[in-house]
């Protein structure tokens, strides 16, 4: 709560933990939790403070960027959403603007090469399945239209039952629709052109990279350029080398 967050002892504990993490050059949250503090570990110190305040507390986030040229952005100055951006050379204004970009657009990686392979594999899998579903749906709709059936009525079992109740179709016609949808979907799914599916899925992946990779994203202050292009408009050699984003809000 705000009451606890503004408490002097709580603020001091948070600052002490941060100072210890920086001094010991911790690389992970587990390393931070294991640090000694007041005869205990950091994790135990947090638990003790939780018992004193009566509110559940957990140290569940730790981010750092090592090196120079790091800009920090605290959204609205409330410590609820903070970002860090590191550039390859001094560029205070540009780094600050990109830090705001990170806050607003929540990129998952710096560029395509930085996206974890597991994420790429999952996104491609989803893209392929979605493409297949769309192709099957188009084939089913085309078959229904050709047979003269209303697409709204044929859309779902609920609509079919509604159509029968209102007298728009007969029970026999509803069965015909069900059978046509089933056979058409099976036939289309068994004969989908693999190369076409892959090409469409690749297009979806390119869209994913554009939306999810920081340097590929449209720059929020000028949608006519990407973040990478914005940086290069200031300095042809300027780029982002690392970024971090941390929020206390569920997203």
Where do the protein language model's features map onto the residues?
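N-terminal assembly/interaction segments in proteins that build large macromolecular machines
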Residues: 1-251
């Amino acid at each position: 709560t705000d009451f606890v967050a503004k408490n002097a002892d709580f603020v001091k504990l948070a600052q002490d933990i941060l100072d210890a993490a920086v001094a010991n050059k911790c690389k992970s949250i587990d390393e931070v939790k294991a640090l000694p503090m007041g005869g205990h570990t950091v994790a135990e110190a947090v638990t003790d403070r939780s018992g004193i305040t009566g509110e559940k507390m957990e140290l569940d986030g730790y981010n750092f960027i090592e090196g120079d040229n790091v800009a920090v952005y605290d959204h609205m100055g409330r410590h609820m959403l903070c970002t860090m951006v590191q550039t390859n050379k001094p560029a205070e204004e540009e780094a600050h603007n990109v830090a705001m970009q990170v806050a607003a657009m929540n990129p998952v990686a710096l560029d395509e090469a930085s996206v974890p392979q597991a994420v790429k594999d999952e996104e491609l899998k989803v893209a392929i399945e979605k493409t297949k579903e769309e192709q099957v749906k188009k084939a089913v709709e085309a078959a229904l239209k050709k047979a003269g059936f209303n697409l709204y009525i044929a859309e779902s079992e609920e609509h079919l039952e509604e159509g029968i109740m209102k007298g728009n179709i007969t029970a026999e016609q509803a069965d015909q629709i069900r059978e046509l949808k089933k056979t058409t979907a099976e036939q289309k799914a068994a004969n989908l052109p693999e190369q076409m599916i892959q090409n469409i899925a690749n297009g979806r992946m390119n869209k994913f990279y554009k939306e999810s990779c920081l340097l590929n994203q449209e720059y929020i202050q000028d949608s006519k350029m990407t973040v990478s292009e914005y940086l290069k408009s200031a300095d042809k050699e300027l780029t982002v080398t690392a970024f971090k984003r941390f929020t206390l809000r569920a997203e």
